[in-house]
């Protein structure tokens, strides 16, 4: 694996917030009460996707990138029907990890930001390890 990702490379992904993206849709338990606004979990997933897209052109066919660390703040609510854009900017490497600054924004401005780290792994090895770890 030789990845020639340049510092400050960016990638973005957009999402129109719909019902399944809302915090109120996250839990399946009726006693859990969450507001009908863009869920933090969906924001994190969008940020991860942006970072993964920055790495994807450099991966071999048997590789993918996986998130191993994320630290974010979700600072503003977004209602359904609004477009959210998540962005990732490559900061550099820390040993085998690829470090990204991530942020998300809607029409009103920034809604969240943080740091995300990804590792590049062999798909077969990852799946075999996951299966082995959960074997009874």
PLM region spans:
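Short, well-structured hydrophobic secondary-structure segments
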Residues: 38-58
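Catalytic strand-loop segment that frames the active site of acyl-thioester-processing enzymes
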Residues: 2-38
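Basic/polar N-terminal segments that are highly enriched at the extreme N-terminus
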Residues: 1-3, 135-136
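A generic structural signal for short beta-strands and their flanking turns/coil linkers
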Residues: 9-13, 66-70, 82-86, 96-98, ...
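Hydrophobic beta-strand-centered segment that forms part of the acyl-chain substrate-binding groove
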Residues: 51-85
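HotDog/MaoC-like acyl-thioester-processing domains
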Residues: 79, 89-136
